[in-house]
Amino acid sequence: MKAYQREFIEFALEKQVLKFGEFTLKSGRKSPYFFNAGLFNTGRDLARLGRFYAAALVDSGIEFDVLFGPAYKGIPIATTTAVALADHHDVDTPYCFNRKEAKNHGEGGNLVGSKLEGRVMLVDDVITAGTAIRESMELIQANKADLAGVLVAIDRQEKGKGELSAIQEVERDFGCAVISIVSLTDLITYLEQQGNNTEHLEAVKAYRAQYGI
């Protein structure tokens, strides 16, 4: 686990974006942890979040031409990631996002920002069912662009309805890499290294044994 990944986990815990306990997911599964990126909700939080996304992007080595943030949660993520790339990595990246409803006046259309062209890096908070990715792919293909990859905050590394995770299904269906700032494996490593969260560690390990990929 790299320094920025450890710092991200500590940041998420500090902001209660990441919590350990018992939580019922939409799928009905009882999870020993919960991640709610919506709680990164101040200017300082957003600035820090962008730095972690930018670090993961640079670390991945994936080449791309434009950042795309799917409405709604992806919009501030794409924006802050673009700012962090410029401020901390001297990379001036175009970014754009979509409207949920197309507009017929003014600039019109359903895209805001730069053109959606070339190799597109899609940024979002998490992938649960992959629905947002599939909707975004329609836009990307309609603009004759290519999906270079997808970056999310956390990879839960758990099976969906079948044997694959939602992220693995996206990788299979669209032939692109999906990267994350941290993964379930990183959370377990963090808990092991802390050494003072035995109860949470055992619960997360048991969850991985049951649902992990």
Swiss-Prot record:
Belongs to the purine/pyrimidine phosphoribosyltransferase family. PyrE subfamily. This is Orotate phosphoribosyltransferase. Keywords: Glycosyltransferase, Magnesium, Pyrimidine biosynthesis, Transferase. PANTHER family: OROTATE PHOSPHORIBOSYLTRANSFERASE 1-RELATED (PTHR46683:SF1). Pathway: Pyrimidine metabolism; UMP biosynthesis via de novo pathway; UMP from orotate: step 1/2. Its cofactor is Mg(2+). Gene3D superfamilies: 3.40.50.2020. Signal peptide: none annotated. The keyword Nucleotidyltransferase does not apply. One of its GO terms (biological process) is 'de novo' pyrimidine nucleobase biosynthetic process. Pfam families: Pribosyltran (PF00156). NCBIfam families: pyrE. It comes from the Bacteria. Homodimer.
